[in-house]
Amino acid sequence: MKDRNDELKDIVKEKYSEIANQSKQQNEISCCGSTGCCGDVDYTIFSEKYDTLKGYNPDADLGLGCGLPTEFAQIKAGDTVIDLGSGAGNDCFVARALVGDAGKVIGIDFTEAMINKARENAKKMN
C-alpha cells in the first residue's frame, strides 16, 4: 500500500507528464503563467519575457516557471549551472547561452516525459 507521499509524487508525475505531452496550444498555464489558476489574483508579474533572451527556445517555454531565475543567479561564462525541476529546458537553454562553451548546464527533472521533451528541444537548438 502506498503512503501519502508516494501518492502525491505519482500525482505530480502524472500532471507534469500530461503537460509535457500536450501541444503548446493545449498546455494549461500554471499559477505563475499569464492566465493563472488561482481565482482573480493577477500573477502576470511573474510571467516575465524570455523571448528577448539569448538561448530562448519557444518550444521549451511551457509557461510553468515563475520569473527569470537566470537574471538573479549571476551566471557567468565558465560557470556550472544545475537546474532542478528543469522541465522542457527553458532555463537551461538560457543558462547555456550565459555560461558559453567553457561552462556546463545540467537539467534535472522528476518526470521522464519532461526530460524527453527537453532532449527534443535541445536537438532543435544544435
For every predicted segment, state its role.
Residues 12-21, 47-52, 63, 100, ...:
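A broadly tuned "polar low-complexity/structure-edge" signature
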Residues 5, 62, 111:
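Charged, low-complexity surface patches
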Residues 40-80, 90-98:
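Conserved alpha-helix/loop element of class I SAM-dependent methyltransferases that forms part
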Residues 59, 77-126:
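Class I SAM-dependent methyltransferase SAM/SAH-binding core
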Residues 1-41:
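N-terminal auxiliary segments of SAM/dcSAM-dependent transferases
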